Structure formats: structure tokens, C-alpha cells
């Protein structure tokens, strides 16, 4: 999500705590997306849809070498629902559904000395994963349920450094950030529910755990952007250390492994002062690749987007479409995603300069 944010329209990155020290005013970024996924297997086909807030960030600076930012961003969204019937040897009907969300709210502060800025981010991460398994025999009026609920939270600390400078013909910036390993605390509940009638229900707890359950892994990120007049090029990548094994009762067991991602994007604006409307648009293209800690396959994606600057303003809006594939041997998934975003830039808290 947000594959072009590293270069597209100069949007700031929540993963880089030092970005606000290089601003020249107040900036608010807002973006959301809608996504449709199609999964294909040799004997089945499924279509799912989802949508969410992608980024909400407010940054400001007084123009004297320091900045402050706050924001909200989703870390992960997942879910599925399956249903099947068996006739032999014992007929029954079963369903299995899983949904999970994880979000992070954060505060950032940054200080700049000449072309170098240092930043710190404090984040609060919370997530909920719920799995519901149901089994119903022909003799049952109501199904039996296996309910699994996992709630996690963590305090996340990130440090970042950002170097930004320019020459007569070029401008460039280089950024690095490191997220520290953090303990994940919360509760895990695994229960069985037997419905004798609409009013008589038996509940049995199979597993309950509370306290420190796992660790949120450390990660490294780096990126570089290069621009000249009407075009801009950006490259970004990240590496995340291996998380712990996913071995809670009620979920599939999975061993964690290290993961990485890389993205490349380019933006071109023919002539910002042209009278023709299409010459004032910002044209974007990008590509993206990612591996996952609990899945063997990789994600390959490409993005196309356009941006438009508001008249007589530094604020911009953009629209992008992304296509991605998860190549696999038995189950293949591909998706379309449409993202819409706005970046408002104003000169609040900055003293006007009179030459």
C-alpha cells in the first residue's frame, strides 16, 4: 500500500521520523484505498474486497530547525471466510473465518542542523486477531463453535536520520531509520461453545494466556531520492528481523523468518507553468517486491498514478492504481488496488520573509 509514497508528490513517510525537520510549513497527508483480490485454485475460485485508511499524518515546523508530527497508520489487515459441506462418511457443514487488524498511532520529533536531521518516533501498536470455526451436523439446530481471540499491544521506538541538500541542477535526500525490538503483551483466549438451544449454551475454555506473548521484531529501512527540474526518482528498501513462531492454540503453527521489501518509483511533471492542463499533471510509475515472515511466496506489484496541484497552492492530490500478484504452485492470488490521497501544505507557524 502506498508504493509511490517514497517519491510520489514528495509525500512524507511515517517510517522516517526525521522528515518534519526539513519541512517549510505545515503539511497534512491523508490517503485511503479500496482493494479487490481474486484467489484461484485447481477446483475453487474466491473474490474478496477490502478498504481502509492508508495514512493520516500531520506535520509542522517553525522554520528554525525543528519539527513535530503525529499520525495514524495501519500496520496490517487480513481476513478470509470459507465454507464447505461433507456428505461421507458423516455429513456435516463447516465454516472457518479469520479476521485481523493492526494499527499504530505515533508521535515524532526531529531536529535539523544544516542539511542533516535526526528524528525520534514513539508509537503505540495494537492489534486483534479473531478466528471462528463452526461445525454443524444434520441433527443439530445450532452449530458448535471454536473461538480464538488474540489481542496484542506494544510500545514502538524508532530512530531516523535524513540528509537533504541540493546543487544548481540537482536535489537529493538520503534517509535511514531503525525500529527497535519491542515486547508484545496482551491476551490469548481459545474456547469451545456448545449450543444446546438458543438459551442454553455451554462454554469451555481450552487455553488462556495473559502477559508477554511475543516480540515485535526490529527492522531497518533506507531510501534515496534524486530530482532535477520536472522529474524525480526514488529507491527504498527495508529489512525486518525474524519474528517468533506463531504457535498459539487455535491458529496454524508457523515459524517466523526474516523478510524484506524494495520499491522503485519515478515521477515526471512536463511543465508546471503550462496553460495546457495535461502538462501540469504529475505522472507516476513504480514497482514493488516484498517477502513475508510467515509465508513462502513473494508479492510483485506495479503502480501507475497521476497527481494534480491545487491552483496557486503547494497542496496536491493524487490517484493511483496498483496491480499485484502472489505466484504460488496451487493457490494463486492477484489483486487490483485504487488509492486516493491529499497533501495539504501551508505556511502556518512560519514567519514570512521580506526581501
Please give the residue ranges for each predicted region.
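N-terminal, post-signal peptide beta-strand-biased segments of exported outer-membrane/organellar beta-barrel
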Residues: 1-74
